[in-house]
Amino acid sequence: MIRARLRSNGWVFAELFLVFIVMWFLCDSLGCLKYTFYRPLGYNIDHVYQLSMIKGGESWDSSMTNADKYLGILQKLEREPAVEVAALSYWSLPMSGNNSYNSLAVQDTIGCELRIINATGGYTRVFRMKEDAKRPFAAMPVRGDVTSGNYVMLSEGAADYYKERVPGFSLDTPLSWYGDSANVVIQCGMIGSFRSYRYGADAEWAFRRIDENVIRTELRDDGAQIVFRVRENMDSPDYRSKFLKEIAPHLDTDNMFIADVVPY
């Protein structure tokens, strides 16, 4: 009788132990997801908006490229009193499916596949990314060829990748595009760690600043994205409706119109 009870209780304890193990793994997984979700992104999207632009109309200036129109909109937007800073970029927004990749190598052997960020100087300030005040992205040199320019600014995640594999790696270490050791790529600074997505690891990006010349000559017909940060004291729940009614009509350039503006 005692043996039967022990056998019965043993099954109960085994079931309780199994439930404990399942609950432990479930709570641990949920805890990790919660930690990852609420861990700082490394940039700030409060008071940040993105323009949605369309082309249309029965007539247009054939001498103007897409680049001319995007730049016209950007320049008008930057003059708006409520706008703190604005930026134009190509395939480069965080939390976006638009991607452009290339591989940078050290000593032409140790390479890392990096997302290439092509953006104007205001990009890091729009998203309030961490950067060295003495070596800001906005002051970085510009070189032509958006796919293989000679100046980059690595994200901290990318720099850490190289540091783990190359003893003594620093901002002074020369790089090269993988398979092209003849052309040296110079590091111009570093952007503090951040994540592309809420559940992502530290991003491995390489930033390249583009100016009007690069935009007009190399990106003239490509589609761009424009984002901007509104001054905190001038942002409000009805800012979008005010923007579309009062500001958007003044930004339209040739046959490129502002269709919408959305919080990032």
Annotate the PLM regions.
Residues I2, P40-Y43, V142-G144, T217-E218:
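Short secondary-structure boundary/capping segments
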